[in-house]
Swiss-Prot record:
Gene: hemL
GO terms of biological process kind: protoporphyrinogen IX biosynthetic process
Family recorded in the similarity comment: Belongs to the class-III pyridoxal-phosphate-dependent aminotransferase family. HemL subfamily.
The protein's name: Glutamate-1-semialdehyde 2,1-aminomutase
Primary location group: cytoplasm
């Protein structure tokens, strides 16, 4: 047995499923998950000593690559001053200043510890601010594991074939209206059915938890217009897209202004950080200045803030997003060319530093139904064959891939060459 197999066997006796987040168990592709010993740049190294070109990037945060020296040094320096204080620090102020400068729609920001905390808190705030209970989310989108959001959720819920999670009371779920991504008519129908009851829409601007599905041109502006018409707030969940699709996020890339924004992943530079923020009048409703309660023992943790501050300063440097786009475009085009040579029907969506691979005869993939029609069994074989080639893709047909600026064009070309060999045998 390999070291990964031995560790996985031991882990399953101690940790449910052997992992601390379901998708890591390779449930979506079968087999034994890799146990990782270290990572550097664009590469992961497993406990058995094998190296992989990494397109998971810790599920998005590693936009600069693994073990970036600026982030590593910031963490070491912060740790030497203490691990946690439970009191305000200067770095929290500096971090808030930087985030609000980089994302102009965020007049104010509140730091939390995860993307789930960010979305959960933003929805509570929207409900408290509007005095309404219902929310709209979209089929196949995932916004963390808060009870009100595990209704036809994407990500692991799709992989496990569970559109709803046991343990979510029906009384919670009834306030969550699920519409079709990229379908404005379904959203208007929901508003017309409950014109005075909907507090907010929450949306992944690029759906990254049913692989990678970008919005159609009129979709996000249409959501903004419907929120304005019916007095609801628009929450854009940029946990995945923030600082990746563009410096100011997908909202800037697509030209839509939300009332609230949720951030995670890149904002922590690899540490557990989330944030939500937006209009000043809405944020003023948060405790302690307002009646909507939200709190966290480790929110604004000094080490996490130092990591995030270092990461965002690096991400804000000229050329970062142009490089991400160039690398991702080359990968997407190369995969399509290789698939066509082998007669494999393939769609590759990509935006900025995100991409998605779909085995399908369809010309495009634009919604949950399109994603579910793709050939998952072929993806499973593709995943394992690419893994054998030293390429680590997301171990699920329903998860996006992530590029970093640490990837070289040689890495991309080697990945395309590996895919060409795999397609010939697929």
């Amino acid at each position: 047995m390999s070291k990964s197999e031995n560790l996985y066997s031991a882990a399953r006796e101690l940790i449910p499923g052997g992992v601390n987040s379901p998708v890591r168990a390779f449930t979506g592709v079968g087999g034994t998950p890799l146990f990782i010993e270290k990572a550097d740049g664009a590469y992961l190294y497993d406990v058995d000593g094998k190296a992989y070109i990494d397109y998971v990037g810790s599920w998005g945060p590693m936009v600069l690559g693994h073990n970036h020296p600026a982030i590593r040094n910031a963490v070491i320096e912060a740790a030497e001053r203490g691990l946690s204080f439970g009191a305000p620090t200067e770095m929290e102020v500096k971090m808030a200043q930087l985030v609000t400068e980089l994302v102009p729609t965020m007049d104010m920001v509140r730091m939390v510890n995860s993307g789930t905390e960010a979305t959960m808190s933003a929805i509570r705030l929207a409900r408290g601010f509007t005095g309404r209970d219902k929310i709209i989310k979209f089929e196949g989108c995932y916004h963390g594991h808060a009870d009100c959001l595990l209704v036809k959720a994407g990500s692991g819920a799709l992989t496990l074939g569970q559109p709803n999670s046991p343990g979510v009371p029906a009384d919670f779920a009834k306030h969550t209206l699920t519409c079709t991504y990229n379908d404005l008519a379904s959203v208007r129908a929901a508003f017309e059915q409950y014109p005075q009851e909907i507090a907010c829409i929450i949306i992944e601007p690029v759906a990254g938890n049913m692989n990678c599905v970008p919005p159609l041109p009129d979709f996000l502006p249409g959501l903004r217009a419907l929120c304005d018409e019916f007095g609801a707030l628009l929450i854009i969940d940029e946990v995945m897209t923030g600082f990746r699709v563009a410096l100011a996020g997908a909202q800037d890339y697509y030209g839509v202004e939300p009332d609230l924004t949720c951030l995670g992943k890149i904002i922590g530079g690899g540490m557990p950080v989330g944030a939500f923020g937006g209009r000043r009048d809405v944020m003023d409703a948060l405790a302690p200045t307002g009646p909507v309660y939200q709190a966290g023992t480790l929110s604004g943790n000094p080490i996490a803030m130092a990591a995030g501050f270092a990461c965002l300063n690096e991400v804000a440097q000229p050329g970062v997003h142009e490089t991400l786009d160039e690398l991702t475009t080359r990968l997407a085009e190369g995969l399509l060319e290789a698939a066509e040579e082998a007669g494999i029907p393939l769609v590759v969506n990509h935006v900025g530093g995100m991409f998605g691979i779909f085995f399908t005869d369809a010309e495009s993939v634009t919604c949950y139904q399109d994603v579910m029609a793709c050939d998952v069994e072929r993806f499973k074989r593709f995943f394992h064959m690419m893994l054998d080639e030293g390429v680590y893709l997301a171990p699920s047909a329903f998860e996006a891939g992530f590029m970093s600026v640490a990837h070289s064009m040689e890495d991309i070309n080697n990945t395309i060459d590996a895919a060409r060999r795999v397609f010939a045998k697929l």
